[in-house]
């Protein structure tokens, strides 16, 4: 047996950061090297995402158990992969895709397939004695991403009256990732003081951002500008803002309901254009419904030369959806979530397609996260230049930032911060 062959695969049901079950897999090679991976789970999910398999047994975890996915790994995936070379990631992933046989990984579960896919890459990097980012990215894996830090939550991520799902700070003006992280943490602390001074709640949402009850979406933007200035930084020049509108969540029958009233797509486009003119907004994610391709094209024509327009629910990390966006000139950026497509190989192919067509890529977490830090390595490996992994609190978020600090340290003088070399947003 060759030392890089897969000898066994373990799997178990664990908990994510919301206390809901998710899948963990361990791929063990014949030489004893192993890789461990946990998969995340989203709250606002796009309709076209790969299928997350849940048990549906109301007696366990309200039907959200993942024992079926775990069993699929042990009984179906393991027998097919044992004996295969862990260094051939594409072969491993294709074997699982073929075994599943469905268009959206609904037979075995994208959560089962992804856990094994990521654990395989980690086992392979260990047997080669390489860090994961170096194994996946080769000698050019030295670009640290600009973080888009979600510090105020609304929409589906919080129980408040703010329509926009995420308000982010983007410290692109820093010289290093370490400095960018410090800036973000200082603004987050400053925001806490600004909220407290206005008697607003400082409890946090799923991704560690504050979820105060605010009068409007503009009120959130005003708070962020104030917090940035209070921390001693310049809004726009050093730290900009980004939004995740998650517009599919407040879309019905061709209308968008926000600020207490229904609006047409054109009105929403003009509304966002107005916000981007008034505030230092460099990136807007999911500004329109995931099937409103025409409006996406109109928005991109109107705003695309000034603002990064990011497709998340629109593209769901799917190369076929992305190709349509490229052809129709809908958006100019894609959010990358491993569990939307379900294998590492397909994720890398989607990032490559984006890059070849001058779309930016943002590597992203999900609202239900784990201590797994794969996305930090993926951001560096692919030179994406941007990462979305939540706020500056909750250890499942901070784990990714801390991993990036270690990578930057390890790279030493070779490390380059995307914001400092003009490869981030802003």
From Swiss-Prot:
Catalysed reactions, as listed in the record: (2R)-2-phosphoglycerate = phosphoenolpyruvate + H2O
Gene3D superfamilies (UniProt xref): Enolase-like C-terminal domain (3.20.20.120), Enolase-like, N-terminal domain (3.30.390.10)
BP-aspect Gene Ontology terms: glycolytic process
This protein's record includes keyword Secreted: yes
GO MF annotation, one: magnesium ion binding
Residues binding (2R)-2-phosphoglycerate: 165, 337, 366-367, 388
Active site: 207, 337
Keyword vocabulary terms for this entry: Cytoplasm, Glycolysis, Lyase, Magnesium, Metal-binding, Secreted
Needed cofactors: Mg(2+)
Binding annotation for Mg(2+): 244, 285, 312
Compartments, record wording: Cytoplasm; Secreted; Cell surface
EC number: 4.2.1.11
Top-level EC class as recorded in UniProt: lyase
CC annotations in GO: cell surface; extracellular region; phosphopyruvate hydratase complex
Cofactor notes: Binds a second Mg(2+) ion via substrate during catalysis.
Stored PROSITE patterns: ENOLASE (PS00164)
Pathway: Carbohydrate degradation; glycolysis; pyruvate from D-glyceraldehyde 3-phosphate: step 4/5
Keyword Cell membrane appears in the UniProt entry: no
UniProt-listed Pfam families: Enolase_C, Enolase_N
Entries under HAMAP family matching the protein: Enolase
Family: Belongs to the enolase family.
Function: Catalyzes the reversible conversion of 2-phosphoglycerate (2-PG) into phosphoenolpyruvate (PEP). It is essential for the degradation of carbohydrates via glycolysis.
Record-given protein name: Enolase
Designated gene of the protein: eno
């Amino acid at each position: 047996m060759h030392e890089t062959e897969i000898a066994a695969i373990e799997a178990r049901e664990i908990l994510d950061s919301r206390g809901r079950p998710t899948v963990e897999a361990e791929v063990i090679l014949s030489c004893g090297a192993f890789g461990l991976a946990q998969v995340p789970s989203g709250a606002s999910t796009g309709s076209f995402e790969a299928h997350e398999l849940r048990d549906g047994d109301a007696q366990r975890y309200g039907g959200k158990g993942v024992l079926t996915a775990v069993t699929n790994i042990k009984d179906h995936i393991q027998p097919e992969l044992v004996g295969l070379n862990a260094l051939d990631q594409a072969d491993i992933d294709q074997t699982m895709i073929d075994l599943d046989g469905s268009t959206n990984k609904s037979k075995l579960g994208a959560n089962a397939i992804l856990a094994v896919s990521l654990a395989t890459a980690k086992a392979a990097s260990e047997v080669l004695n390489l860090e994961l980012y170096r194994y996946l990215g080769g000698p050019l894996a030295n670009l640290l991403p600009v973080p888009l830090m979600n510090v105020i939550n609304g929409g589906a991520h919080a129980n408040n009256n703010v329509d926009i799902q995420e308000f982010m700070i983007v410290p692109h003006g820093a010289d290093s990732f370490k400095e960018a992280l410090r800036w973000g943490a200082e603004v987050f602390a400053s925001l806490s003081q600004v909220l407290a001074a206005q008697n607003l709640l400082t409890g946090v949402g799923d991704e560690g951002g504050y979820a105060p009850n605010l009068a409007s979406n503009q009120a959130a933007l005003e708070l962020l500008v104030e917090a940035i200035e209070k921390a001693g930084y310049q809004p726009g020049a050093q730290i900009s803002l980004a939004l995740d509108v998650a517009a599919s969540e407040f879309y019905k029958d061709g209308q968008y309901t926000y600020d207490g009233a229904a609006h047409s797509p054109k009105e929403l486009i003009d509304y966002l254009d107005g916000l981007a003119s008034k505030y230092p907004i460099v990136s807007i994610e999911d500004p329109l419904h995931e099937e409103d391709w025409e409006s996406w094209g109109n928005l991109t024509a109107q705003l695309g030369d000034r603002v990064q327009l990011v497709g998340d629910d629109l593209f769901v990390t799917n190369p076929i959806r992305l190709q349509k966006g490229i052809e129709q000139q809908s958006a100019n950026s894609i959010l990358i979530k491993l569990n939307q497509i379900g294998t590492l190989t397909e994720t890398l192919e989607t990032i490559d397609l984006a890059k070849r067509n001058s779309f930016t890529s943002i590597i992203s977490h999900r609202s239900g996260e784990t201590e797994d830090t794969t996305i930090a390595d993926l951001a560096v490996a692919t030179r994406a230049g941007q990462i979305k992994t939540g706020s500056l609190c909750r250890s499942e978020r901070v784990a990714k930032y801390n991993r990036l600090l270690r990578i930057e340290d390890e790279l030493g003088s070779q490390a380059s911060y995307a914001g400092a070399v003009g490869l981030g947003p802003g």
